[in-house]
Amino acid sequence: MTAKSVLLAAGMCLMPGLAFAQANPVYIEKIDMPMAAAAHEVESVLHDGGYKIVLKLNILKLIGAQQKTLKIPHFNERHFSDIRAIVFCNPFDFSKLINSSWPVAAGCPLTLDIFSKGQTSYVVYGLRADYALTPQSRKIAEALDTSVIKVLQGIPMSRVEKGIPDIGKK
């Protein structure tokens, strides 16, 4: 796999998250664990909730490895120790979306990102319901968001964050 293809894959995973962060609210769960433990717990609750993990990317590592070439100004100013993306899907929800309004199925597989700094991690999931094109697909997308949130609330040592946490640039 070439560096360009790795960066393209990383960008494709991040782009949906960025669109949701700007256009829609995001759901944030704070976990009192470092990345390795937090990622393991997130993957476990997703699996137990009926989701299939399609792809896992260490975004910070992939882009950081290209920093000398890319020369991104102010890269990782908040000094996250790790940022990972998880692409996942519930096959049954995917089938419902295809059958109700097939273009909306582009929102599934779903993505979430885990941001870690020291012993604390944050799971960020962009809500999908506002992107539904029909009342039927909106109902399915709302149920999907509710299901994902319920699953994420099962992460041990976690709690819902109200608003966006102030992660200092220290």
Model region roles, listed by residue range:
Residues F115-S121:
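A short, structured loop/turn motif at beta-sheet edges
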Residues M1-L7:
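Bacterial N-terminal signal peptides that target proteins for export
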Residues A38, V42, F94, I140, ...:
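Stable alpha-helical elements in mature extracytoplasmic
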Residues L110-I114:
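Hydrophobic/aromatic beta-strand elements that line small-molecule binding cavities or substrate pockets
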